[in-house]
Amino acid sequence: MIRHFLRDDDLSPAEQAEVLELAAELKKDPVSRRPLQGPRGVAVIFDKNSTRTRFSFELGIAQLGGHAVVVDSGSTQLGRDETLQDTAKVLSRYVDAIVWRTFGQERLDAMASVATVPVINALSDEFHPCQVLADLQTIAERKGALRGLRLSYFGDGANNMAHSLLLGGVTAGIHVTVAAPEGFLPDPSVRAAAERRAQDTGASVTVTADAHAAAAGADVLVTDTWTSMGQENDGLDRVKPFRPFQLNSRLLALADSDAIVLHCLPAHRGDEITDAVMDGPASAVWDEAENRLHAQKALLVWLLERS
């Protein structure tokens, strides 16, 4: 059976743990260990600009002994009038996996519905599951066991990071809180899915408009840009509601004394996070960015071994 990774709950708790364990192993020996069997080609398609996703996937595939074919959709027939389904059928004859950074989640779902190779969500408007695998790897490195930790996210609760942290976090047994202003809350269907998964793992889901309450005693504090790609023209009116949710030294002081800070990047310093926090001793941002490489390599190996 072909396994896809389109959203965080595509992995069971046990499967997520397997991927994270493999990511830790690959990080110990990132170059010489090349576990892909035979020549492997991977299509890496971008509808949106990228730094970390492009470098980490392209280099990671090479380190595994595979070959990445990296294109932007505008340079293919996908950017014109060929259907997603036709593109998926053709690419499935050429490559062993498809990695796609795109807009609506429905585009990934449509491609996966006919692809005969694994399809990986490298970011959509709704989810960012590869990033959250890297986040979980980083948390495990700093904190040890994930189960029972308290993670609080601050900012736009309706964006892809909030959604993926909800699903991926509770899958790992983490208690996840989303602190966001009214009008920017998680999608109800995503929250419901996270609550169902949390029942299986002993985790919990909390959504609040009180940033201070969310920070109190937290083990992990996470934020993301207040203006996602495609929202740049919304102006200052969009930014204003998020000001009380800035991840700054005052908010960090409310958390556990050993708390860590994550940001998937790029950061708008002075908006969602201050320099003092991002560059301070609690920051694990740079480890988090590096772990995109290792977590995605592990995911590719895991999927290809099972497809």
From Swiss-Prot:
Catalysis performed (reactions): carbamoyl phosphate + L-ornithine = L-citrulline + phosphate + H(+)
E.C. numbers: 2.1.3.3
Enzyme type, top EC level: transferase
Primary location class: cytoplasm
Keyword Cytoplasm in record: yes
Keywords assigned: Amino-acid biosynthesis, Arginine biosynthesis, Cytoplasm, Transferase
Positions of disulphide bridges: none
Highest rank taxon of the organism: Bacteria
Subcellular location(s) per record: Cytoplasm
Known regulation of activity: Competitively inhibited by L-norvaline (NVA).
UniProt: L-ornithine binding residues: 160, 224, 228-229
Gene transcribed to yield this protein: argF
UniProt function note: Reversibly catalyzes the transfer of the carbamoyl group from carbamoyl phosphate (CP) to the N(epsilon) atom of ornithine (ORN) to produce L-citrulline, which is a substrate for argininosuccinate synthetase, the enzyme involved in the final step in arginine biosynthesis.
Protein name: Ornithine carbamoyltransferase
BP GO annotations: arginine biosynthetic process via ornithine; citrulline biosynthetic process; L-arginine biosynthetic process
Subunit structure, as described in the record: Homotrimer.
Lineage: Bacteria, Bacillati, Actinomycetota, Actinomycetes, Mycobacteriales
Positions annotated to bind carbamoyl phosphate: 50-53, 77, 101, 128-131, 264-265, 292
Family of the protein in this entry: Belongs to the aspartate/ornithine carbamoyltransferase superfamily. OTCase family.
GO molecular function list: amino acid binding; ornithine carbamoyltransferase activity
Keyword Amino-acid biosynthesis attributed: yes
A GO CC annotation given for this chain: cytoplasm
A Pfam family of this chain: OTCace_N
This protein's pathway: Amino-acid biosynthesis; L-arginine biosynthesis; L-arginine from L-ornithine and carbamoyl phosphate: step 1/3
